[in-house]
Amino acid sequence: MEKAIRNFLSQESAGGILLLVAVVLAMLMANSPLAGLYQGFLGTEVQVRVGALDLHKPLLLWINDGLMALFFLLIGLEVKRELLEGALSSVAQASLPTFAAIGGMLVPAGIYLLFNYGDPVTQVGWAIPAATDIAFALGIMALLGSRVPVALKVFLLALAIIDDLGVIVIIALFYSSDLSTISLIIASIAIVGLVALNRKGVTALAPYGVLGLVLWVAVLKSGVHATLAGVIIAFCIPLRAKDGSSPSEHLEHSLHPWSTFLILPVFAFANAGVALGNMSLDALISPVPVGIALGLMLGKPIGVMLFSYVAVKLKLAQLPDGIGWKQIAPVAAMCGIGFTMSMFIASLAFEQADPMFGDLARLGTLIGSILAALIGYFWLSKVLPKKGV
């Protein structure tokens, strides 16, 4: 278990650096003479036609609907494994990160709504600061090496996974619209087929892949966001086969490098390019970016700490062995690194609004995430032992 976690964390740390490079490159291109090339590339129309099925979308939407569905497939596999066998498999293990994650979603959302109260156009972005980017947060923590206790890393990992689960629920409930009955029926049939494969003990991944593709197309056409198809597929793939092997973990390990070194960097590059030249000072300090930045930088640590403290005091949860509040606090600050997950929700929240709101949301996400990363890193570095244990 510990070896698997260490391997996961080391890969995510490398991915965090690549994510940062992708963001910097996107910002440079969006604010240089190459801006037209950057926007034109993302706006390139890509069409896939099979018989009566015709999918015709700009490259940006293929990235957000297609590649991110694979990322959510990976998240679903991780959540299922942790729920059945890992850090969330018992009430005692799951209690503290669960309360922490709930607080870390509610308080940032509340701060955002406080700044955007009474504006129906911008209020839809309330969930943007509720997300945590697991790759970037773990990458920042990994910079401190062996000084960080494994129990603290597991706490952040468990908290971020529960946070991801919350984001999945939020997308399903609040960012789906104009539902197509026929597409939902087809999606339901595909889900029944996936469940039947699981119940029959089918461990070959190919049948799940075929039905999963049908499900993804149906969900894409249904009005429900297509990334949710990835989560459903993940929950249907068996964790353990009769011979003791794990089809779910095999797929998870296969997807990890693709997610870490391709999917997330490509998503970050496609979504982080904010043209600053078109923004006035008033826009930069408007409720959307300020609400998001403060929600991430202040709301996340306040929510995580407040709910964790109350849960421990009420004996609903307990701190990990050897870990105190002075170590939990900077980790709570790191949870404010929303980055790719927050930008993804921003792309959904302001999909039908003026593009300016999407740019402001991404800018607020970048500012809040960078400040949260710096605060969390230096704070944790200060409270940890100077030498590795």
UniProtKB/Swiss-Prot annotation:
Topological category with respect to the lipid bilayer: Multi-pass membrane protein
Gene3D superfamilies according to UniProt: Na+/H+ antiporter like domain (1.20.1530.10)
Any Pfam family hit: Na_H_antiport_1
Catalytic reactions on record: Na(+)(in) + 2 H(+)(out) = Na(+)(out) + 2 H(+)(in)
GO molecular function ontology, one term from the record: sodium:proton antiporter activity
Location in the cell: Cell inner membrane
Keywords, ordered alphabetically: Antiport, Cell inner membrane, Cell membrane, Ion transport, Membrane, Sodium, Sodium transport, Transmembrane, Transmembrane helix, Transport
Gene Ontology terms: biological process: regulation of pH
Transmembrane stretches, start-end: 17-37, 59-79, 95-115, 124-144, 154-174, 177-197, 213-233, 261-281, 287-307, 328-348, 363-383
GO cellular component term, pick one: plasma membrane
Principal localisation: membrane
NCBIfam families named among the record's database cross-references: NhaA (TIGR00773), PRK09560.1 (NF007111), PRK09561.1 (NF007112)
Family of this protein: Belongs to the NhaA Na(+)/H(+) (TC 2.A.33) antiporter family.
PANTHER family, alphabetized: NA(+)_H(+) ANTIPORTER NHAA, SODIUM ION/PROTON ANTIPORTER NHAA-RELATED
Function: Na(+)/H(+) antiporter that extrudes sodium in exchange for external protons.
Protein name: Na(+)/H(+) antiporter NhaA
